[in-house]
């Protein structure tokens, strides 16, 4: 049976193909997570986004906490969001979604050349876990080249990380690999508030010895995964020193808290696609808060 298209329909079909371009075999993804407290946005955003070495990732997702979210108009977002927008627009990016709550934000950008009308049919949900709205998460999901991407950020309390009581709230409602139509590429970034379960003196001793593996043996994320929170999610190998808790504007740990990796990046495919971590590092030049930001770079195969 032959399918005949009108001239108008044929033209629309061709224009649609041209708008999206031929699908590449792979796309690059950068994710950034930073609990910044209430400090002003930094001026050097290129390093924060992983653009300082001439890279042009196809997708950039930024999860932030702080930067003055507790304002009279939190929906307008912190100043850093505007700064991201100004920088990335000049480099050919389009903002797909910017979601701000009282305690966190998630902003996703994509190179404009990859976008078509289907990409803009994105979905965002906000999950609140406690009555004070301090714990919860955001998910933004969208489609590029018929592949579904989902980015999740969450802000957890100390109890959330190891409690089975919050498994439903986080794992079931925020994990888009468990939907009837699972996402192909999923990334979970943010301040997971994961701590190291040893005393500060012992942790500092292991840091001074650069014994990262030894310190990671006490990491709460391992326990959380044993309790099936973040079930099936993978983290790139951690080779950098703990990102919390620093004395602001120094490289010295504040030992009122055990040095820990609070901001994390996890990845997962709901359809068996390949996600390759390329690098995973803390950005030690950003010293103005108790936390160091974490930048992860990935390559996904379409």
From Swiss-Prot:
GO terms for biological process: nitric oxide transport; phosphatidylinositol dephosphorylation; vasodilation. Residues 1-20 form the signal peptide. Heme binds at residue 80. Its cofactor is heme b. GO terms for cellular component: extracellular space. Coiled coil: none annotated. Keywords: Allergen, Heme, Iron, Metal-binding, Secreted, Signal, Transport, Vasoactive, Vasodilator. Binds 1 heme b (iron(II)-protoporphyrin IX) group per subunit. Gene3D superfamilies: Endonuclease/exonuclease/phosphatase. It is found in: Secreted. This is Nitrophorin Cim l NP.
């Amino acid at each position: 049976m032959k399918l005949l298209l009108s001239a108008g329909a044929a033209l629309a079909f061709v224009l649609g193909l041209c708008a999206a371009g031929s699908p590449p075999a792979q796309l690059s993804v950068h994710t950034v997570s930073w609990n910044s407290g209430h400090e002003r946005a930094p001026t050097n955003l290129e390093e924060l986004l992983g653009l300082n070495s001439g890279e042009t990732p196809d997708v950039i997702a930024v999860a932030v906490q702080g930067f003055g979210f507790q304002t009279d108009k939190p929906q307008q977002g912190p100043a850093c969001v505007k700064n991201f927008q100004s920088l990335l627009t000049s480099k050919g990016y389009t903002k797909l979604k910017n979601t701000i709550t009282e305690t966190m934000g998630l902003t996703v950008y994509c190179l404009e050349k990859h976008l078509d009308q289907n990409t803009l049919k994105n979905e965002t949900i906000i999950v609140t876990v406690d009555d004070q709205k301090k714990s919860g998460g955001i998910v933004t999901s969208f489609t590029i080249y018929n592949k579904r991407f989902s980015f999740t950020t969450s802000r957890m309390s100390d109890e959330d990380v190891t409690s089975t009581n919050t498994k439903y709230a986080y794992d079931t409602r925020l994990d888009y690999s468990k939907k009837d139509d699972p996402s192909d590429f999923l990334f979970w970034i943010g301040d997971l508030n994961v701590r190291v379960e040893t005393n500060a003196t012992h942790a500092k001793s292991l840091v001074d010895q650069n014994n990262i593996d030894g310190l990671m043996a006490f990491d709460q994320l391992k326990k959380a995964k044993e309790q099936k929170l973040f079930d099936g999610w993978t983290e790139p190998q951690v080779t950098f020193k703990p990102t919390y808790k620093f004395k602001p504007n120094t490289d010295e740990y504040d030992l009122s808290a055990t040095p820990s990796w609070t901001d994390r990046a996890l990845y997962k495919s709901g359809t068996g696609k390949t996600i390759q971590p390329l690098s995973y590092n803390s950005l030690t030049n950003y010293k103005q808060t108790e936390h160091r930001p974490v930048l992860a770079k990935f390559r996904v195969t379409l």
